[in-house]
């Protein structure tokens, strides 16, 4: 796929060329390279509110929000102030701080977990939660779902979503058969497949791990009380349920996805919003299980920068701002974006369905809702690249992959939505005119 680089991306092109000589693919996370859509990746210089500004001075309405964390938009004054205050007192101590305890209290107050361990990334959170589940149950097998992405953990990359879906990789070289031999993969939203797996491996499965709502194969909501049924099946066999709320946590509601379906999983992972946009994440769960972690128990987990005081300050400030009224605004903005996208595509006669999981959304270029990874791939995905690039050329920054979720912030204005509406007209036309290769 080719897409012409226009003159107003000259500095991005220059820096991308330099980056490719120093960094694999020129990026530090694959989807940023525009690999599935082609064209010139934009190097962002700064952002304020709902606006991204690249190194060439181009401005974009941001519908990525750093892949979820920026609920209030970029550089919110209260978050900036909290970070500035933390920085002057020291960047890292390698010792306990009051802020760590207060952030843990914030998480416990809003979710079903009783205890929390802070880490540095969503990948660390899911890796640690799986290790803890195995240690607690004294079992080795784990069950995951096609299209659900839980970070680049070796055992969890089998049939993963996100960047793995974008680049059509079933897993990754460098991961041995031994590392995935205890990973059972079944279709998402298929409760009978889960029951069959437990029937085939009775007493062997340590945990089920699932995204609380799918966000890495496009947006796919759990259906028919799926998470509640997972919990019941796991407990009936002595296994645990891990719900990955790295994406949905404090994004989809005040209490995350737990606030929507009230399923109290044994272990829950958090990231993105809880970090305030800095490198931080967490996992938590029932005290009986969490107390298996060192130094209280035998399951080892550690991190030099875990609970970093600057990241903790950003996370606490973000959660303080994220009250119930904020979600009313974000949900309304998601509904408004949903309507604009659907109206534009309908006007051009493009078959589509807007996938929703609360205020998270994506586009399936086919009729009807997708309920699993196979459904999401069985669409006119070739329409997305021209749709994306036309939006980008008209000042709207959407996720550069059909398999990624769109995020809105409370910072979006009427002017932003007017810009989005105008950009969607030629974008929908480009999608309609696209041809399968």
Swiss-Prot record:
Q: Which UniProt keywords apply?
A: Cytoplasm, Isomerase, Porphyrin biosynthesis, Pyridoxal phosphate
The biological processes this protein is annotated with in GO are: protoporphyrinogen IX biosynthetic process
Pathway(s) annotated for this protein in UniProt: Porphyrin-containing compound metabolism; protoporphyrin-IX biosynthesis; 5-aminolevulinate from L-glutamyl-tRNA(Glu): step 2/2
User: What SUPFAM superfamilies does this protein's entry cite?
Assistant: PLP-dependent transferases (SSF53383)
Question: Which family does this protein fall into?
Answer: Belongs to the class-III pyridoxal-phosphate-dependent aminotransferase family. HemL subfamily.
Query: What is said about its interaction partners and assembly?
Result: Homodimer.
What protein name applies here?
Glutamate-1-semialdehyde 2,1-aminomutase
Q: What is the lineage of its organism?
A: Bacteria, Bacillati, Actinomycetota, Actinomycetes, Mycobacteriales
């Amino acid at each position: 796929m080719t897409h012409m680089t226009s003159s107003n991306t000259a500095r991005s092109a220059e820096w991308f060329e330099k980056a490719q000589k120093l960094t694999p693919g020129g990026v530090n996370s694959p989807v940023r390279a525009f690999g599935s859509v082609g064209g010139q990746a934009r190097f962002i210089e700064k952002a304020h509110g709902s606006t991204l500004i690249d190194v060439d001075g181009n401005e974009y309405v941001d519908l990525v929000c750093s892949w979820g964390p920026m609920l209030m938009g970029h550089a919110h004054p209260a978050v900036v102030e909290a970070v500035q205050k933390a920085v002057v007192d020291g960047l890292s101590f390698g010792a306990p701080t009051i802020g760590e305890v207060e952030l843990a209290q914030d998480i416990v107050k809003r979710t079903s977990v009783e205890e929390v361990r802070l880490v540095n990334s969503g990948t660390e959170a899911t890796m640690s939660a799986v290790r803890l589940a195995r240690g607690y149950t004294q079992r080795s097998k784990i069950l995951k779902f096609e299209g659900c992405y839980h970070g680049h953990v070796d055992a969890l990359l089998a049939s993963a979503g996100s960047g793995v879906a974008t680049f059509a990789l079933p897993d990754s070289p460098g991961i041995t058969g031994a590392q995935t031999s205890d990973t059972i993969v079944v279709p998402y939203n298929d409760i009978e497949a889960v029951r069959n797996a437990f029937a085939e491996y009775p007493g062997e499965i340590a945990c089920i791990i699932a995204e609380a709502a799918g966000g890495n194969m496009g947006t796919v909501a759990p259906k028919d009380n799926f998470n509640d049924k997972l919990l019941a099946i796991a407990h009936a066999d002595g296994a645990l349920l891990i719900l990955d709320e790295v994406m949905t946590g404090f994004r989809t509601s005040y209490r995350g996805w737990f606030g929507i379906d009230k399923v109290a999983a044994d272990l829950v992972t958090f990231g993105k919003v809880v970090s305030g946009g800095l490198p931080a994440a967490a996992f938590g769960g029932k005290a009986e299980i969490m107390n298996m972690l060192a130094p209280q128990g035998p399951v080892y987990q550690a991190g030099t920068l875990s609970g970093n005081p600057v990241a903790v300050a950003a996370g606490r400030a973000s959660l303080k701002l994220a009250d119930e009224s904020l979600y009313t605004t974000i949900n309304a903005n998601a509904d408004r974006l949903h309507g604009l996208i659907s109206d534009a595509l309908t006007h051009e006669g493009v078959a589509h369905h807007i996938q929703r999981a609360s205020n998270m959304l994506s586009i399936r270029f086919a009729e009807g809702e997708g309920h699993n990874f196979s459904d999401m791939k069985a669409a006119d995905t070739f329409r997305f690249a021209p749709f994306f690039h036309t939006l980008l050329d008209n000042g709207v920054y959407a996720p550069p992959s059909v398999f990624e979720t769109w995020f809105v912030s409370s910072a979006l204005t009427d002017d932003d939505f007017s810009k989005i509406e105008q950009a969607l007209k030629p974008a929908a036309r480009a999608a309609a005119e696209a041809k399968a290769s």
